[in-house]
Amino acid sequence: SGVITDVSDKIWDYAELSLREYKSGELYAKVLKEEGFTVEHPFDNIETAFRASYGSGKPVIGILAEYDALTGLSQIAGSETRKELVADGNGHGCGHNLLGAGAMAAAFAIKKYLEEKGEGSGKVILYGCPGEEGAATKAFMARDGVFAECDAALTWHPGNVNQVTSGTCNTCIQTEYKFTGVASHAAGAPDKGRYDLDAVELMNIGVQFLREHMPDSARIHYSITD
């Protein structure tokens, strides 16, 4: 338990953003090697991803770990009120320091079971899945067939209740549209101007009407960034 707590605390302090979890990925790789796992890091052409395996035979159980932080959520550990560790810094507002460490604890528990059962009784694989917050690296890993070797894959998420959930989640597709206007003199040549915000508003109106014809399971959200 000391190893797990130490990793969780360090990941909390690192607070690295999606696809920049260099210290976090290296820490997991180091600890897992010390615990007797075979580690690939980087993995699947993702610099901060890793694959750590132990055992042989069937079944093959995959455990998914996440460890990325969020912008602007730096927080002193243990404080129940807002206290930044680093001014305007990153922080684990979604508890991914716990998620990754807890997933590793599960992998350790399965490893212990496999050691007791003996050679050929199964395999456990801990996948380090960076960039959950927006980058969706697990989708690319699935595309590459990474999880095809598993008979089952499990993960968890910190929360204020203990429960088992199942089901599906919506696919996340992000698209960026850029609108460019034409400047003109408001009094001398107003008809020559083209206001880009007008185009943005017209597009949003169209999206509002589109929602009526979409299935209940689909969602469209937008953000005007500039």
What role is predicted for each listed range?
Residues T48, L70-G72, T81-G91, N97-L98, ...:
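Histidine/acidic-residue-rich, glycine-tolerant segments that coordinate divalent metal ions
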